[in-house]
């Protein structure tokens, strides 16, 4: 029996049929292949990346690097753009951008022991959201998960409109052995 989720968050972009736009792996089974195709929209604001887990290890990795490493994850979701890449903000982010949305994302601490999920309280730019991960959360790599439909649910907190959405990240307490 599965543990009750401590947190639920939409976990990446999806098509009208709710399939993930890019890589989606659940319980070691690849449901959607990794995408390296060009296109429009935030997903294709390259570089994009992959949030993944393997044998208790977590990562946020730029897509090309992920492919080169040949990672075979237990779970993964691909989205984009990367917010922070090796400690630097995505090169296409503008400090004075007028594109403001509610945004959510994920980053992993440098030592790999702390995962940070974040959702903005108000509409923010990619620059503002990226600086949260780089400067305050100190994550060397962080990934944008989604914008307009950003949602999170934790004990006592429910933000965003819960409607049918694509990938969902669920975090549960570790099961006792």
Language-model-detected regions and their locations in the chain:
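Gly/Ser/Thr/Pro-rich low-complexity, intrinsically disordered segments
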Residues: 1-177
């Amino acid at each position: 029996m599965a543990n009750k989720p401590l947190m639920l968050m939409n976990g990446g972009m999806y098509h009208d049929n709710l399939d993930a736009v890019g890589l989606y792996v659940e319980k070691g089974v690849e449901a959607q292949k990794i995408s390296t195709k060009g296109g429009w929209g935030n997903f294709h604001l390259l570089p994009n990346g992959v949030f993944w887990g393997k044998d208790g290890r977590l990562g946020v990795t730029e897509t090309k690097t992920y492919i080169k490493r040949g990672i075979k994850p237990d779970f993964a979701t691909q989205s984009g753009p990367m917010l922070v890449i090796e400690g630097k903000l995505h090169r296409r982010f503008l400090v004075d951008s007028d594109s403001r949305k509610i945004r959510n994302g994920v980053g992993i601490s440098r030592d790999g022991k702390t995962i940070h999920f974040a959702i903005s309280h108000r509409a923010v730019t990619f620059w503002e959201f990226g600086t949260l991960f780089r400067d305050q959360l100190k994550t060397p790599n962080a990934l944008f998960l989604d914008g307009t439909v950003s949602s999170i649910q934790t004990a006592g907190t429910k933000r965003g409109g819960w409607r049918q959405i694509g990938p969902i990240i669920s975090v549960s307490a570790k099961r006792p052995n």
